Regions:
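Acidic/histidine-rich, surface-exposed loop or edge segments in extracytoplasmic proteins
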Residues: 30-41, 130
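Surface-exposed short loop/turn segments
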Residues: 52, 56, 61-66, 71-115, ...
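Solvent-exposed, flexible loop/coil residues
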Residues: 26-29, 37, 115, 125-126
């Protein structure tokens, strides 16, 4: 009986916790901007992920007088740094760092320049294929976090 009550209460609390996906269409409507031109340079993997995410942020359904139309130039840099080594000189920890340098233009006039950096420290793995796969996953996650910060800053531009 206690198990059923606990399960019911758990379901009740979790179903009404107010969770909303960050990238839902409802939340994207709050971003009153459209990206008319996107120039990317730097790390290819980061640029592909950025292009995939930023292409969804053009919102033509917003009234034209309220919509800001931006042109973006983004330079990306990805760096893998060895942070810790063991006694024999082998790397035990790495730091993956992604930096985005963003130039925002509106009507061919530069209105903002800013930089976004995301970092993650992780342990080495003896299996190189697993390590490479994990590093790619980390790079994608860091890119998503950095692009989220970029879109938040774009939404705040008046």
């Amino acid at each position: 009986m206690k198990k059923k009550i606990f399960t019911f209460l758990l379901f009740l609390f979790l179903s009404s916790c107010g969770y909303e996906a960050i990238y839902s269409l409802k939340n994207r409507a709050n971003y009153a901007f459209q990206i008319s031109k996107l120039e990317l340079s730097g790390d290819r993997q980061v640029n592909l992920k950025m292009k995939q995410i930023l292409s969804t942020y053009s919102n033509p359904n917003i009234a034209i007088e309220k919509r800001k139309i931006f042109e973006l130039k983004i330079s990306s840099d990805s760096e893998k740094i060895t942070t810790t080594k063991n006694a024999s000189g082998d790397a035990t920890k790495f730091k993956n760092e992604i930096t985005l340098k963003v130039q925002v233009s509106m009507d061919r006039t530069i209105i903002s320049n800013f930089s976004v950096t995301e970092k993650f420290i992780y342990n080495n793995n003896s299996n190189t294929s697993e390590l490479r796969s994990y590093e790619n996953q980390i790079k994608n996650n860091l890119t998503e976090a950095a692009v989220d910060k970029v879109t938040s800053k774009l939404a705040l531009i008046k």
